């Protein structure tokens, strides 16, 4: 519950959104703006949504080199990315894309590399693992690693995820690292 008199400040300064695909970007933006209008009775543009690949945007500074060369990566979007990167984040909620183990090249859903995140996975989850190492470069592990590195102290991470990390041998290092990095873990 958030009192109405605090909503404007939260909306303008504390709620942020990232999306890599253009249609979900617009849908998220519309949903956020519509909810704000429903709660307050007035429309206000939501200025804290960015069109960006979260996993390419590491180091929390300008890094657009690996972003797709697309017409909508405007100066305004770049400014929004910089603004988000400078913010202290205490809650991250996400639904990482799933594209591990595609059946063939024609699925057009390749697992691309993310050097900065993949290095962090190697330094943490893989370093602590006794299992096959390549499975830890899936999108779930990447987003969890990014979130763990990005979150502020006393922060919360909530993801929609499969359950492979609970018992799979390939996630033994992940489980060790997460147990060390977090004081509480809830799996629903």
Where are these regions (language model features)?
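SAM-dependent methyltransferase catalytic region
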Residues: 1-187
């Amino acid at each position: 519950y958030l009192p109405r008199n605090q909503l404007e400040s939260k909306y303008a300064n504390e709620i942020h959104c990232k999306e890599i695909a253009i249609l979900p970007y617009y849908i998220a933006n519309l949903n956020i703006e519509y909810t704000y209008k429903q709660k307050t009775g007035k429309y206000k543009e939501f200025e804290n949504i960015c069109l960006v690949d979260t996993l390419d945007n590491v180091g929390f500074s300008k890094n657009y080199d690996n972003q797709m060369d697309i017409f909508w990566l405007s100066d305004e979007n770049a400014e929004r990315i910089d603004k988000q990167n400078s913010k202290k984040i205490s809650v991250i909620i996400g639904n990482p894309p799933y594209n591990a183990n595609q059946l063939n090249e024609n699925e057009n859903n390749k697992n691309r590399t993310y050097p900065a995140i993949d290095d962090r996975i190697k330094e943490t989850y893989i370093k602590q693992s006794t299992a096959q190492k390549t499975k830890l470069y899936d999108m779930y592990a990447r987003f969890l690693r990014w979130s763990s590195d990005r979150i502020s102290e006393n922060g919360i991470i909530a993801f929609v995820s499969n359950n492979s990390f609970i018992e799979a041998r390939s996630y033994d290092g992940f489980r060790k690292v997460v147990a060390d990095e977090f004081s509480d873990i809830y799996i629903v």
